[in-house]
Amino acid sequence: MPPFRTGATSFVYPASWAANVERLAGRVEDIELLFFAPQGPDGLPDPAELQRLVELRDRHALTYSIHTPLSASLASEDDARRAAGVAEVLRVVDATRCLSPSAYVLHVYWGDAEHGPRPSDDEAFRQRAARSLRQIIAHGLAPELLCVEYLDYDLDLLAPVIEGLELSVALDVGHLLRDGRDWAAILARYLPRTRLVQWHGTQPGGRDHQSLEHVPREVARALVEQLTAANWDGVLTLEVFEEQAFERSLALLSQLQQEITCRA
């Protein structure tokens, strides 16, 4: 058996968080509960659904990782927008605290959204990000539960903050592959701090979060081999949002694990 656990997202089926967890339980060990836009009336689970999520967690020995809102701009040059982003994250933290999450995934953009321009002052960017992250930690969270996601820039730019605050990393290998980055070197660099590896394929036209069928087989095998050889005990999340993509990805992962076991 691999040292790592397998995860799925709460958007595999067009249904509620709990309905997804109920169908995925027994097939994966962790569910990444997605709260991309929690501002609306249906943006967060109600008390009954939260209780159901607790019951499912306990019955199936699951863990939950929480993906915080995409709109939270934690290093914005606009102080009001940055404060609003912190408040968005904390709203999700408060709503899901009863689930005892094993990780909280955070986006720290260069500006106010992904693919924005590089900030003119790197140190000021780090200071703004650190201020927001300290506020989130001060809300009663263990620093290592906060996972800064590797986005569209070199995370070494933010590494002093991550290391200084003793945070963790969510390594989106799907995006690294999409962007043509040296995923193996980046994985080796950050794996000791990585609690989650997010994995998905990219179609030829550039659409990501697709089936792992779109990842070259030798690359997919190399990733699983690297995680296994490192005895990494985090969560490998199949970060796809559709049933067929999930089924095909899970089947491919199982095949790779069997191949690696047979060769060992």
Language model: regions and residue ranges:
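Active-site acidic/histidine proton-transfer and metal-coordination neighborhood
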Residues: A75-V169, I260
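N-terminal pre-domain/capping segments
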Residues: M1-T68, A72-R91, C262-A264
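A short acidic, helix-capping loop that chelates divalent metal ions and anchors anionic groups
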Residues: Q39-P41, A72-E77, D112-P119, G205-Q210
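A short helix->loop->beta-strand "cap" motif at the edges of active sites that frequently abuts
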Residues: H60-L62, P101, P143-E144, A229-G234
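Active-site beta-loop-alpha junctions enriched in small/polar residues
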Residues: T9-Y13, L34-P38, P69-S71, Y109-G111, ...
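Charged helix-capping and loop-helix junction motifs
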Residues: P45-R52, R81-L90, D122-A130, R181-A188, ...
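Hydrophobic faces of well-ordered beta-strands that scaffold small-molecule active sites
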Residues: F4-S10, E29-L33, Y64-T68, Y104-L106, ...
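Histidine-acidic metal/acid-base catalytic patches
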Residues: M1-R5, A19-E22, A75, L155-S168, ...
